[in-house]
Design a protein with these regions (language model features):
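Short amphipathic alpha-helices in soluble, non-transmembrane regions
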Residues: 20-25, 80-86
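A short, local hydrophobic-aromatic micro-motif
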Residues: 6, 30, 66, 90-91
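Conserved beta-strand in the GNAT
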Residues: 52-55, 114-115
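Vicinal oxygen chelate
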Residues: 4-13, 32, 41, 59-121
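Core segments of cupin and vicinal oxygen chelate
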Residues: 2, 9-50
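Short loop segments at secondary-structure junctions
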Residues: 46, 73-75, 109, 120-121
């Protein structure tokens, strides 16, 4: 079963500036990774709620929400279920070394990107 929202990825014109803005709203830096060159993960101060993953836009990308990711316990099973239900544009599952997670990306009927994610730890 697909669980709660794990994270919301935002592509910003300046990741550091966006992370500082979220800190002003009460979010705390969870970790910084080399994902997308440099990425910040921020969580609510009370730990209750999804993370924001922030990175600086590259190339022809434009600032905005890149995707919303949902936590899962068994990514292989959920990916297979999505394929059987003919969900569009499934890519994955695949492991991302820089985050220690396995992800599958897919799109909604309007082409927006969604993701399921499983911690590998």
């Amino acid at each position: 079963m697909i669980g709660e929202i794990d994270h919301i990825e935002i592509e910003a014109s300046d990741a550091t500036e966006m992370a500082d803005f979220l800190k002003k709203l009460g979010y705390e830096e969870h970790r910084e990774t080399e994902h997308h060159g440099q990425s910040f993960e921020l969580s609510p101060a009370d730990g209750d709620g999804p993370l924001f993953e922030i990175h600086t836009v590259e190339g022809e990308e434009v600032p905005g929400i890149n995707h919303i990711a949902f936590a899962v316990d068994n990514i292989e099973e959920i990916t297979e279920d999505l394929e059987e239900k003919e969900v569009d544009a499934i890519v994955g599952p695949y492991h991302v070394d820089k985050t220690g997670r396995t992800i599958t990306n897919f799109r909604d009927p309007d082409g927006r990107r969604f993701q399921i994610v499983q911690d590998d730890e």
